[in-house]
């Protein structure tokens, strides 16, 4: 599976309509781009209680077995899945198992599934008003979450992207892998080392990358991504970026992400397109998966809002699209080899190929 291309879609803001049907209509273009795996952000019904914004966060889920009615019906979703498969691609769903909305259906049926602080449902870390944490240490919670995954596998999905996987009790993933088999894709959102150390210090759940990789196919590159963003914001140095990449590469298979729904558009860090393209080339040259957030393939600068209806404005820069298309083609031919990365005279050398970053 390595050296494939993942394409992230926020269905609500993918089009003016914000529906599965509009995504399905665009699948030929996505296939032409060279995408292997389509990753959908959460598609479930969103909680109303303490909702943020008009539409709410897709990560504040009311019912894991539901479809948000704004996006379409279950039949629409299954049609999308079938079309993805017909075109030779795979599709994975975002699963949010660390927390739910405060009015999730489990609140009434299984209040014991939740984490309590001072007698009240709450969060282990932070104080987010639109979510409450599940207690994933409990076996009954683990079994329930595995049943959620089984349900969506029966609908035809090929795997899952797990939100904040590092903060979910590891037996959830062990049980899921045992129940679903090795062919189901497990893509994990891990956390950077600094936040991981904080979680350990407060005795919260923290699963290290090395542990996650016992059952996961791939993890985000957040450790070096955050170093890169600091460098581009003139708050860090290139040596720290390279150090983080070297630390990641021997252990894990990374999804080399430059932008997503949590971060600014990568184009926003650059005044000239040539520097932007050089960073993209470098990222593609690294071992692991390539990652594109909807619109990135055109160099779009506007990042859709998470809590509102804010569709992508498809300003189609065909030259940029072809740039990504060519990189995706090369990615598929790329061989995994031990990567030698060094800095010399202001240039990054990756296996003797120079990048001016």
Stretches found by the model and what they are:
Residues 12, 41, 67, 163, ...:
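Conserved residues at the C-terminal ends of beta-strands
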Residues 147, 163-249, 254, 282, ...:
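Active-site-proximal helices and loops of the catalytic beta/alpha 8
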Residues 1-2, 48, 52, 215, ...:
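Loop/helix patches that line or flank the sugar-binding groove of alpha-linked glycan CAZymes
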Residues 19, 69, 73, 137-141, ...:
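Residue-level preference for long, well-ordered alpha-helices that form the structural scaffold
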Residues 44, 97-101, 166-168, 192, ...:
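Active-site-proximal loop/turn and secondary-structure-junction residues that shape catalytic pockets
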Residues 36-38, 158, 290:
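Short acidic/polar active-site loop segments enriched in Thr and Asp
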Residues 1-35, 43-155, 173-181, 185, ...:
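Substrate-binding/active-site clefts of carbohydrate-active enzymes
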């Amino acid at each position: 599976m390595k050296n494939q291309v993942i394409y992230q879609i926020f269905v609500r803001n993918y089009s003016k309509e914000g529906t599965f049907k509009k995504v399905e209509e665009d699948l030929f273009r996505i296939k032409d781009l060279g995408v292997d795996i389509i990753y959908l952000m959460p598609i479930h019904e969103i909680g109303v209680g303490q909702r943020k914004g008009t539409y709410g966060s897709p990560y504040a889920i009311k019912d894991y077995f539901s479809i948000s009615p704004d996006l379409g019906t279950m039949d629409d979703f299954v049609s999308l899945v079938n079309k993805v498969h017909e075109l030779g691609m795979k599709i994975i769903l975002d699963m949010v198992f660390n927390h739910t909305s405060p009015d999730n259906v489990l609140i009434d049926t299984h209040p014991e599934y939740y984490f309590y602080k001072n007698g009240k449902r709450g969060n282990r870390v932070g104080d987010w008003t639109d979510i409450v944490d599940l207690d994933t240490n409990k076996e009954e919670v683990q079994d329930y979450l595995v049943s959620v995954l089984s349900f969506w596998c029966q609908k035809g999905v090929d795997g899952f992207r797990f939100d904040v996987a590092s903060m979910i009790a590891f037996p959830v993933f062990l049980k899921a892998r045992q129940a679903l088999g090795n062919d189901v894709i497990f893509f994990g959102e891990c956390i950077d080392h600094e936040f991981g150390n904080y979680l350990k210090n407060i005795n919260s759940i923290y699963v290290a990358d090395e542990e996650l990789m016992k059952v996961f196919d791939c993890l985000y590159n957040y450790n070096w991504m955050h170093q890169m963003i600091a460098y581009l914001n003139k708050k860090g140095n290139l040596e720290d970026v390279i150090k983080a990449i070297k630390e990641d590469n021997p252990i894990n298979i990374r999804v080399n992400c430059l932008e997503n729904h949590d971060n600014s558009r990568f184009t926003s860090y650059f005044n000239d397109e040539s520097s932007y393209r050089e960073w993209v080339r470098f990222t593609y040259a690294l071992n692991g998966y390539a990652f594109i957030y909807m619109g990135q393939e055109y160099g779009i600068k506007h990042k859709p809002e998470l809590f509102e209806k804010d569709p992508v404005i498809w300003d189609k820069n065909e030259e940029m699209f072809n740039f990504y298309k060519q990189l995706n083609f090369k990615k598929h031919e790329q061989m995994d080899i031990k990567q030698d990365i060094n800095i010399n005279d202001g240039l990054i050398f990756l296996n003797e190929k120079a990048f001016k970053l």
